[in-house]
Amino acid sequence: MSDVEIKVENIVASATLGKSLELPKIAPALENVEYNLEQFPGLVFKLKDPKTAALIFGSGKLVCTGAKCIEDSIKAIHMTVDKIRELDTEIPEEFEIKIQNIVASANLGKVLNLEAVALDLENTEYEPEQFPGLVYRLSDPKVVLLLFGSGKVVCTGAKTADQALLGVQKTKERLIELYLIEE
């Protein structure tokens, strides 16, 4: 595989707590909370360490965003649940945490002619009047890459960092095969 490094920029994880939550009771009892039902159907609870935001919904669903590694994402969810438990809200001990999306960035180290890439590479969308990047959809791994003329890449839709890395590596190799970049 080609030598390319990725940097995880954001991880989105979710948990279903199996119990509805009384947001009007929870919101005033927590610090660093934004709660305005007219603007958003849940409350936003910000943690400082790890620096994340947890979206808490009345249905008992929780979404954590902002972590740079899976461990921090899981830790943030557990910290959020512990804070809710401190408010005399019973939450089952066992609940499932799912990684929904990992966003990673990379640099191919080469300038890309996106018009040529759009013509030669399958499963792409490129509308420079709408967005400066080219959208490239891979089926294995099932990720979406945004390619920019500078050679910078953003990978989204991965469930693991390895999937994101593989997506970027396969893309670089395909671009080399099509003579769209040099090795």
Curated annotation (Swiss-Prot):
Spans through the membrane: none
Keyword tags: DNA-binding, Repeat, Transcription, Transcription regulation
Record bears the keyword rRNA processing: no
GO biological process: one example: DNA-templated transcription initiation
Pfam families per UniProt: TBP (PF00352)
Listed Gene3D superfamilies: TATA-Binding Protein
Sequence repeats: 8-84, 99-175
Keyword match Thylakoid: no
One function term, GO molecular function aspect: DNA binding
SUPFAM superfamilies reported for this sequence: TATA-box binding protein-like
Family annotation (InterPro entries): TBP, TBP_archaea, TBP_CS, TBP_dom_sf
Family: Belongs to the TBP family.
Role, per record: General factor that plays a role in the activation of archaeal genes transcribed by RNA polymerase. Binds specifically to the TATA box promoter element which lies close to the position of transcription initiation.
This protein's name: TATA-box-binding protein
Native species: Methanosphaera stadtmanae (strain ATCC 43021 / DSM 3091 / JCM 11832 / MCB-3)
Encoding gene, per UniProt annotation: tbp
